[in-house]
């Protein structure tokens, strides 16, 4: 009986861990944080401060490249996922 309970608990814990990894968390990105995150994603710059080396005009170029609804509308005014941010990369 105890072995069955432990096994069941293990299955539940593993299921919860896997379902958490599969869901991408939506966050808000505004201002400098938005620009730095886009630079990191679009230019493959390391997260440890490399975004500051991305040229300003490149960063600005991708801030509104999807038509009327810009990245600010989708990711600053409401939460978005990294997949949405990646869709703004050239």
From Swiss-Prot:
Signal peptide (UniProt feature, chain positions): 1-20
Cited PROSITE patterns: INSULIN
GO molecular function: growth factor activity; hormone activity; insulin-like growth factor receptor binding; protein serine/threonine kinase activator activity
Disulfide bond residue pairs: 30-76, 42-89, 75-80
Annotated phenotype, changing residue 49 to S: In strain: Showa
Keywords: Cleavage on pair of basic residues, Disulfide bond, Hormone, Secreted, Signal
Consequence of substituting residue 65 to N: In strain: Showa
A family per Pfam: Insulin
Coarse class of the protein's main subcellular location: secreted
Note: Silk worm has two kinds of PTTH: 4K-PTTH and 22K-PTTH; there are many forms of 4K-PTTH.
Family to which this protein belongs: Belongs to the insulin family.
Quaternary structure (record): Heterodimer of a B chain and an A chain linked by two disulfide bonds.
Protein role: Brain peptide responsible for activation of prothoracic glands to produce ecdysone in insects.
Name of the protein: Bombyxin B-7
Native organism taxonomy: Eukaryota, Metazoa, Ecdysozoa, Arthropoda, Hexapoda
Gene expressing this chain: BBXB7
């Amino acid at each position: 009986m105890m072995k069955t309970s432990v096994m069941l608990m293990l299955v539940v814990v593993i299921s919860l861990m896997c379902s958490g990894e599969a869901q991408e968390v939506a966050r808000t990105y505004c201002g400098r944080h938005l620009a730095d995150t886009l630079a990191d994603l679009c230019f493959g710059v390391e997260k440890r401060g490399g975004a500051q080396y991305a040229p300003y005009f490149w960063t600005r170029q991708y801030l509104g490249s999807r038509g009327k609804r810009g990245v600010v509308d989708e990711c600053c005014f409401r939460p978005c996922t990294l997949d949405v941010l990646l869709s703004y990369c050239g």
